[in-house]
Amino acid sequence: MRDAEEDMIDILSKYRAKLSNILIHCFTGSQNFANQCIKMDCYYSLSGIITFKNADILRNVIKTLPLNRIIFETDSPYLTPDPFRGKTNEPKYLKTIIEKYSKIMSTDLENIKKESTSNYKKLFQIF
């Protein structure tokens, strides 16, 4: 999706009716892209990028994403969150990503865990 937000919106808009759920993997989009995806009820996976020192713009954008559409990922073995940069990313670092999101959103960590678990179930239609 890098440098292809307009193309992606055009494609998603064209096929939205045929898709049950849309996941924007490893979301790093602009505010405009986020706004368009919100209109299409997309889900967003957030990775270790939200912990990076130079990700202030992304952190501001994700504040506008609805919590009921957020899931978390490590994207292992890549995108290791701070303070573990330089190491191979592992699933155990998911906790670091969720804790950072909790701080960004000033939201209770337990609520985020509960909501994101529910989101996984809805997104992947796990009952």
Task: Map each language-model feature to its residues.
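Hydrophobic faces of well-ordered beta-strands that scaffold small-molecule active sites
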Residues: 22-24, 44-46, 70-74
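Short glycine-rich anion-binding loops that position phosphate/pyrophosphate groups of nucleotides
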Residues: 49-50, 77
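Active-site micro-motifs of SAM-dependent methyltransferase domains
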Residues: 44, 78, 122
